[in-house]
């Protein structure tokens, strides 16, 4: 086993991430910000103040993806599923940076209520992130 084993508790308000071999549990608001006039997406760790100052921010990403909703950010309309993908990409970078490892061997995600639509959304996200 060379890759990371990550556990994630994914909710509309906050996401908690733990990684085997790390003592830290990261808590991140389930929201994503986009820097104006760029393609740079960011999440904010609560321990770092949780601020996404100067950015357009979208939250409740699970609900948005589940209802096939959209959000307009910086004049561009994004599907909720796309925003969830960008959020997960950014959040998974946190344990990758902390461990110095890129490969994710196992990812376990818990959600408040398991629904078929949500499982489909998360499977699309895993494909996008190239996680088997």
Feature roles, as predicted:
Residues 67-79, 105-108:
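Short hinge/gating elements
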Residues 1-72, 127, 132:
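Early-domain small/polar-rich strand-loop-helix modules and first-structured segments
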Residues 96, 100-113:
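Short glycine-rich phosphate-binding loop at a beta-alpha junction
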Residues 116-131:
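Short, low-complexity, polybasic intrinsically disordered segments
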Residues 3, 103-107, 122:
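Residue-level recognition of the N-termini of beta-strands and the immediately preceding loop/turn
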Residues 11-14, 111-118:
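Gly/Ser/Thr-rich loops at beta-strand to alpha-helix junctions
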Residues 53, 76-87, 114:
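Catalytic cores of large soluble enzymes that bind and process phosphate-bearing ligands
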Residues 83-99:
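Phosphate/ATP-binding catalytic cores across multiple sugar-kinase/actin-like superfamilies
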């Amino acid at each position: 086993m060379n890759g990371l084993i990550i556990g994630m508790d994914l909710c509309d308000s906050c996401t908690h991430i733990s990684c085997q071999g790390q003592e830290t549990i990261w808590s991140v608001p389930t929201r994503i910000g986009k820097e104006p006039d760029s393609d740079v997406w960011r999440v904010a760790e609560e321990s770092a103040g949780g601020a996404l100052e100067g950015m357009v921010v979208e939250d409740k990403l699970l609900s948005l993806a589940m209802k096939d909703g959209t959000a307009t950010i910086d004049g561009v309309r994004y599907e909720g599923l796309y925003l969830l993908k960008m959020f997960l990409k950014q959040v998974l970078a946190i344990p990758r940076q902390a461990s110095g490892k890129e490969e994710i061997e196992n990812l376990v995600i818990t959600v408040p209520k398991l629904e078929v639509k949500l499982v489909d959304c998360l499977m699309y996200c895993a494909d996008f992130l190239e996680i088997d």
